[in-house]
From Swiss-Prot:
Family matches, as InterPro entries: Beta_helix (IPR039448), K1-lyase_C (IPR056204), PbH1 (IPR006626), Pectin_lyas_fold (IPR012334), Pectin_lyase_fold/virulence (IPR011050)
UniProt-recorded Gene Ontology molecular function terms: lyase activity
Swiss-Prot/TrEMBL keywords: Degradation of host capsule during virus entry, Degradation of host cell envelope components during virus entry, Host-virus interaction, Lyase, Viral attachment to host adhesion receptor, Viral attachment to host cell, Viral tail protein, Virion, Virus entry into host cell
Gene3D superfamilies hit by this protein: Single-stranded right-handed beta-helix, Pectin lyase-like
Gene Ontology cellular component annotations, sorted alphabetically: virus tail
Organism annotation: Klebsiella phage K64-1 (Bacteriophage K64-1)
Function: Functions as a receptor binding protein (RBP) and probably mediates the attachment to the host capsular exopolysaccharides. Displays a lyase activity that specifically degrades the K1-type polysaccharides of Klebsiella pneumoniae capsule.
Keyword hit for Nucleotide-binding: no
GO biological process: adhesion receptor-mediated virion attachment to host cell; symbiont entry into host cell via disruption of host cell envelope; symbiont entry into host cell via disruption of host cell glycocalyx
Family matches, as Pfam families: Beta_helix, K1-lyase_C, K1-lyase_Rider
Entry keyword Cytoplasm: no
Protein name: Depolymerase, capsule K1-specific
Similarity section: Belongs to the K1-specific depolymerase family.
Length: 888
């Protein structure tokens, strides 16, 4: 048989040989050495005859090779070859003799002729591969048949929604691929009458269908074992290396209920020095869970067994061969998954539900993917979900030899030899962060070393703070977790029953991406806070993207960002029933968040504020975010340099946008506050800048200590449009500028400006110009709590009345004998000195439209509040036509 190209180390057996060479069934016998043959002998012997015209078999008995173990086809050995392509590579030399070949690139089947050709042992692709493309081939020798019909391939392109296809050839067997991916005949398709293949799901337009057809059904090894070798006329006890009969081996494999049981019960007895690779079936013959190819890696003596991708048998590392991510269903324990993850540089796809008895610990360069409708469940109240945790060394440290400025990239240290280029370091001091409410947090940053020159460390970003020797600055080496991608996690579910603390906890990390998550919390729906229970905690991490992540019913926060976290983006996320959807927090000893972007996120029904900047942090931006039905403020502002762009706060219990202690340099652009229980915008701590914003249907539209309101609107705010002094410390009041705003009267909004004397507010620090205050008349302001009349605000070019026939605010008049009296209720003059009133007078602009031959200087006199005013020329012969306009 060896001379004919059949080697027994492929586990060839007689019925297969008979089919391959077209011999009559049962014509080939297993003979022992000698000159005669009986059906009871088990060694091959050749008698010198011509074998069906194929060739002379020879005269010597083949005594060196015996049939030792015949493995069923669902667990059969197969010869494979794999390689990783270089960029532009097209040719691969296959180091085996073969007659048949099936080729995959990156897991997708390739079509002969269209995608590749074979010449001798050289496989040539029709297009260049890219660097890292993975080639995987199955090869056979010899061909099962010279009949082309056994190797026929039928291809087609699907129509949108197509579920059936009729093959135009007769066939008995079919192997089906969709877009190059092998389909499971149990779950993906079925074969019916009239050559019709029915798919279990609708196909998409132009899906590529590839069907490999066969005209005959070759008896499977399982059938041969049962029907040929194990009937009453055959030998039932052909021994295997384990000492069991083939039937016993088959029964063990058939009844094994997990991949690990198969490995430990059966495969541990295999001589892996002789066998290159085996295929192991899954839990049952009808499922593929755990199925795969395993090989002995004789170069590995250290990999730890994980029960899914590596098994240690007699100190040999038996490894799973696979392309793409490992599957969680391969592992039988959480410890096994953590062992697999412990090395880093791995990818894992969760393809079945998993109850966590402990947290999953993630290392650098790890990708985690989760199938749709797959859940991770916590098993108890102390179980966290996923942890990415680095550390800061307490021994590999050094100190400064000179102070470091906030803009510097260079750090001069006492001993740079402790560090290497590429190391991450923590730089921290005992100096508190800025702000009146620093909460004991001290300045700190994470940086990467880009260059070392003597005792100078060059860092990848500026220092941000002034680090000094006097503040006991310390530089410590860090062991961080970096380059982690988590995609599609669903943690817990809406019908949760188990309390747990944190779903994902990231500490000392760099370059983290978390996408497409559904994170259900651990408190009763729409009840109060449960401290310490957060969906995503980002502590002292850099370069983090959280995208399309949703969190529900969190006892504490949806996303919490703290420590010296930097360059963190939270994008397109949804938070329901959390204390805060996003909280910029202070609970780490060193460092404050910096450079944080919250974009296109929504919070609903938060226990307190929908979005919170909690006491510290700087350079934080909320863009296109929405807070609905917040239990406190929609957006709470207590950090430095916070910017809000095109955000909405609707139906908050208190303020739409509410400022607290610690807020400095707040800026709101294009934001909208509607239907909030107290203030639409409340900047009563450090003031701020409001531009192009709208306050609609709140109690007060704007509550301000100082700052600017520019190009903004205030409509239907029930108590007043602008409240000067609410919850303010008068000692901190500074100038408030209102310019080019639209604050009109309505039956709901009956006052434009409210000055709180009880808060000691000084109206003269308020300037209002170019603003529409039409409709209020003399009721444009309200004073409260003053014991004596305050000074009036500075007013310029504001519209106070709606232009009408009885109250015209502008018009033209021709002077008679140098004078004219205008009757209009729009003219205002307040001379009262009581504590509840302000003194003011209308500003009347005059412009000569048509001059007479005698002109003089124009002036206003005889203003009667709400009645009239007089225009007078210094020349009593002046008969010019004058345009007049009243403003406040």
């Amino acid at each position: 048989m060896e001379t004919e190209g059949l080697t027994l180390d492929w586990n060839a057996h007689l019925p297969t040989v008979e089919v391959a060479y077209g011999l009559t069934k049962n014509s080939l016998k297993m003979w022992k050495s000698g000159t005669t043959a009986t059906s009871d002998d088990y060694w091959l012997y050749t008698d010198g005859t011509v074998w069906n015209g194929v060739g002379v078999l020879g005269n010597n008995p083949e005594t060196s090779t015996g049939f030792e173990k015949i493995t069923p086809n669902f667990n059969a050995s197969i010869k494979t070859y794999s390689a990783s392509a270089t960029d532009g590579q097209t040719d691969f030399n296959i180091p085996f003799t073969f007659s048949t070949i099936t080729v995959f690139v990156n897991g997708s089947i390739q079509l002969p002729g269209l995608n590749y050709t074979v010449s001798g042992s050289t496989l040539t692709f029709t297009t260049e591969l890219e660097a890292g493309d993975l080639l995987y081939v199955f090869i056979g020798n010899p061909n099962i048949s010279t009949n082309d019909k056994l190797n026929r391939i039928y291809t087609a392109n699907a129509m949108q929604g197509q579920t059936t296809i009729q093959v135009p050839y007769d066939f008995s067997t079919a192997i089906v691929y969709i877009n190059g991916v092998l389909q499971n005949p149990i779950t993906a398709y079925s074969i019916g009458a009239d050559r019709i293949i029915t798919f279990s799901e609708e196909l998409y337009q132009d899906d590529e269908i590839i069907i490999m057809l066969g005209d005959i059904i070759i008896q499977s090894d399982e059938y041969v074992l049962k029907q040929e070798l194990l009937d009453v006329n055959a030998s039932s006890y052909i021994n295997t290396k384990s000492g069991n009969s083939i039937q016993e081996e088959f029964d063990i494999l058939y009844n094994s209920n997990s991949i690990s049981k198969i490995i430990y019960s059966d495969i541990k007895n295999i001589n892996w020095d002789e066998i290159n690779e085996i295929f192991v079936c899954g839990k049952t013959l009808n499922t593929t869970e755990g199925a795969g190819y395993f090989y002995y890696d004789n170069n590995d003596t250290i990999t730890v067994e994980d029960g899914g991708t590596c098994f240690v048998i007699n100190n040999k590392r038996i490894k799973r061969r696979y392309i793409g991510p490992a599957l969680s269903s391969w592992f039988t324990t959480i410890d096994g998954i953590n062992t697999f993850l412990s090395t880093g540089n791995v990818s894992l796809r969760f393809d079945s539900n998993l109850t966590l008895t402990k947290a999953l610990t993630i290392k650098s360069n790890t990708n985690l993917y989760f199938n749709k409708d797959v859940f991770l469940f916590p098993s108890g109240p102390t179980i966290q979900g996923l942890i990415c945790s680095g550390s800061v060394s307490t021994t590999i440290t050094t100190t400064l030899t000179s102070d470091v400025s906030s803009s510097s990239f260079i750090v001069n240290v006492t001993d740079a030899s402790k560090f290497s280029v590429g190391d991450y370091v923590e730089i921290r001091s005992e100096k508190l962060v800025e702000g009146v409410n620093a909460q004991g947090v001290k300045i700190g940053i994470m940086r990467q070393i880009t260059k070392i020159d003597a005792n100078q460390l060059y860092i990848d970003k500026i220092a941000l703070y002034d680090f000094t020797i006097s503040d006991n600055t310390l530089i410590s080496k860090m062991d961080i977790v970096k380059n982690v991608n988590i995609d599609g996690l669903t943690f817990n579910n809406i019908n949760y029953t188990t309390l747990f603390p944190i779903t994902m906890n990231m500490v000392y990390c760099d370059n983290i991406v978390i996408k497409n998550t559904q994170l259900y919390g651990s408190k009763e729906k729409y009840t109060g806070d449960v401290s310490g229970r957060t969906a995503l905690k980002i502590n002292s991490c850099r370069n983090v993207l959280i995208e399309n992540c949703n969190a529900y019913h969190q006892g504490w926060y949806g996303v919490e960002i703290l420590g010296y976290s930097e360059e963190v983006t939270v994008d397109k996320c949804f938070f329901d029933d959390c204390r805060h959807g996003v909280s910029i927090n202070w609970s780490s000893i060193y460092g404050e968040p910096n450079g944080i972007l919250i974009n296109d996120c929504t919070s609903t029904s938060s226990t307190l504020s929908g979005f919170d900047t909690h006491d510290i942090g700087r350079n934080i931006t909320f863009s296109n975010c929405r807070a609905y039905k917040s239990g406190d403020d929609g957006f709470q502002i207590r950090a430095r340099n916070v910017k809000y762009i095109n955000c909405l706060a609707d139906y908050s219990t208190l303020d739409g946008f509410g400022q607290g202690d610690g807020a400095i340099n707040t800026r709101l652009i294009g934001c909208k506050a509607t239907n909030n229980g107290r203030n639409g915008f409340s900047l009563v701590w450090e003031g701020g800048n409001i531009e192009d914003c709208e306050a609609l249907n709140n109690q007060y539209g704007y509550a301000m200590l100082g700052g600017r309101i520019i190009n903004s609107r205030g409509i239907d705010n029930s108590s007043a449009c602008v409240d000067c002094g609410s919850n303010s410390d008068p000692a901190n009041q500074f100038s408030l500028y209102i310019d080019n705003c639209d604050f009109p009267y309505s039956t709901i909004q009956t006052r434009c400006l409210y000055f709180r004397g009880s808060s000691g507010i000084r109206p003269e620090l308020v300037s209002v110009k170019n603003t529409n205050m039409a409709g209020y008349g003399n009721l444009w302001y309200l004073l409260g709590g003053y014991s004596s009349q305050p000074l009036s605000p500075m007013l310029n070019n504001n519209t106070l009345d709606i232009n009408s026939t009885t109250a015209p605010t502008s018009g033209m008049v021709t002077l008679t004998a140098g004078t004219a009296t205008i009757n209009t209720s729009a003219v205002k003059l307040s001379t009262s000195s009581t504590a509840s009133t302000l003194r003011y007078v209308s500003n009347i602009d005059l412009k000569r439209i048509l001059s007479s031959s005698n002109i003089g200087t124009l002036s206003i006199s005889n203003i009667v509040n709400g009645v009239s005013f007089t225009i007078t020329s210094s020349n009593n012969l002046d008969a010019s036509t004058i345009y007049w306009q009243i403003s406040l």
